[in-house]
Amino acid sequence: MDALLTKFNEDRSLQDENLSQPRTRVRIVDDNLYNKSNPFQLCYKKRDYGSQYYHIYQYRLKTFRERVLKECDKRWDAGFTLNGQLVLKKDKVLDIQGNQPCWCVGSIYCEMKYKPNVLDEVINDTYGAPDLTKSYTDKEGGSDEIMLEDESGRVLLVGDFIRSTPFITGVVVGILGMEAEAGTFQVLDICYPTPLPQNPFPAPIATCPTRGKIALVSGLNLNNTSPDRLLRLEILREFLMGRINNKIDDISLIGRLLICGNSVDFDIKSVNKDELMISLTEFSKFLHNILPSISVDIMPGTNDPSDKSLPQQPFHKSLFDKSLESYFNGSNKEILNLVTNPYEFSYNGVDVLAVSGKNINDICKYVIPSNDNGESENKVEEGESNDFKDDIEHRLDLMECTMKWQNIAPTAPDTLWCYPYTDKDPFVLDKWPHVYIVANQPYFGTRVVEIGGKNIKIISVPEFSSTGMIILLDLETLEAETVKIDI
């Protein structure tokens, strides 16, 4: 490995002789860096893990019920008929009666064969182990059940509609249908919460030629057994510093690097402390070399030494090498910013919401992707059966759904660990971002979705360790360009 890096540095030094004078890099800073509270930040001294998750579900149902009712009243207002019968509004799930079309608002709950159970994990001494389950669904036995619930009880949802629409635990919706038999409800239509507001997208400024670009990377997954990842990281550093690209003007437009989680490959059950420290030291070296040239935000991810429950708190500064101490001064937050996961911010008026990707990875396990789209450009991973095509379109669909649901982590706390909030649910959106970034995905992809007249740019950021891919997001046009580093 050392020989490879030495050869790489020799080749780079030859290129340096031909480089023109360095350009001034575009400056990109969070518009509200010093004057806002982070909804995902947890005060260490005030944390209390003794509360029940009941409060989260109650807050979620109460908040979304008002939003969903507004939209349901527009679609199924008084006088709305179905097959000649008047459709009634039911205030409670248990008020649903037979042979009468009606609609009701409630929270979805999925009972699935392979969904993890905390009590079983504790009994079997597997609690806290990595979740290797690819799907919670019972594809062959058909034992899975989807229910609508509220404070009064539950009703089983049936019908063809639930096979073509994602129904995920924790999502609050309005359901139109009719009781098929006692305790079951035939679903005919679904209604999502009323559209959210969105800040106006900033207009071009004549005195400012460009808003610049931010580089997005996730899944560096540095470890002690994969030297190729370290070499890729070295090339990434040289690229961002403009040393392996003749288009220096283009590189100078990249004003910030956002590392979206999984910087190190850390599993507490299989990686010892010394191996972790080696990975963190290499990561620190990368930061030490690049920070004089470009500002960096660092989010934690599933593999990182951070909280295992959402929202993940920022890396602790003690994890980094002493060479970075000067950057942890509050005044240097513009240069090195250790942030939460999820992370919301605004760059030059562009609102961005970023997640490390565990939320979408978990939601994927609730849904069996359809095979109706034909062959995808992204082939199925080896070892996966042909009836489970987890392609980029499937994942973009689910990312879009989280915007429709206005909840970026609906499966928390059922199958996604989260902090037991008592008075709020920070994963519930109050406004839509301009850009929604989901990192550590198998594939790259983008999509512009329009909901209620508002446009949201969705970006799927792939793992760098397996794809060598970084994304350059233009804050002026919201175009996403890929750069691939092969070795």
From Swiss-Prot:
PTM annotation (Phosphoserine): residues: S20
One MF term in the entry's GO annotations: DNA binding
Other known facts: Present with 626 molecules/cell in log phase SD medium.
Subunit structure as annotated in this protein's UniProt entry: DNA polymerase delta is a heterotrimer of POL3, POL32 and HYS2.
Domain of life: Eukaryota
Organism per entry: Saccharomyces cerevisiae (strain ATCC 204508 / S288c) (Baker's yeast)
Protein name: DNA polymerase delta small subunit
GO-annotated biological processes: base-excision repair; DNA metabolic process; DNA replication, removal of RNA primer; DNA strand elongation involved in DNA replication; lagging strand elongation; leading strand elongation; mismatch repair; nucleotide-excision repair
Catalytic activity: DNA(n) + a 2'-deoxyribonucleoside 5'-triphosphate = DNA(n+1) + diphosphate
Intracellular or extracellular location(s): Nucleus
PTM annotation (N-acetylmethionine): residues: M1
Keywords: Acetylation, DNA replication, DNA-directed DNA polymerase, Nucleotidyltransferase, Nucleus, Phosphoprotein, Transferase
InterPro entries cross-referenced by the UniProt entry: DNA_pol_a/d/e_bsu, DNA_pol_D_N, DNA_pol_delta/II_ssu, PolD2_C
Protein's job: DNA polymerase delta (DNA polymerase III) participates in chromosomal DNA replication. It is required during synthesis of the leading and lagging DNA strands at the replication fork and binds at/or near replication origins and moves along DNA with the replication fork. It has 3'-5' proofreading exonuclease activity that correct errors arising during DNA replication. It is also involved in DNA synthesis during DNA repair.
The EC number(s) this enzyme carries: 2.7.7.7
Gene name for this UniProt entry: POL31
Coiled coil: none
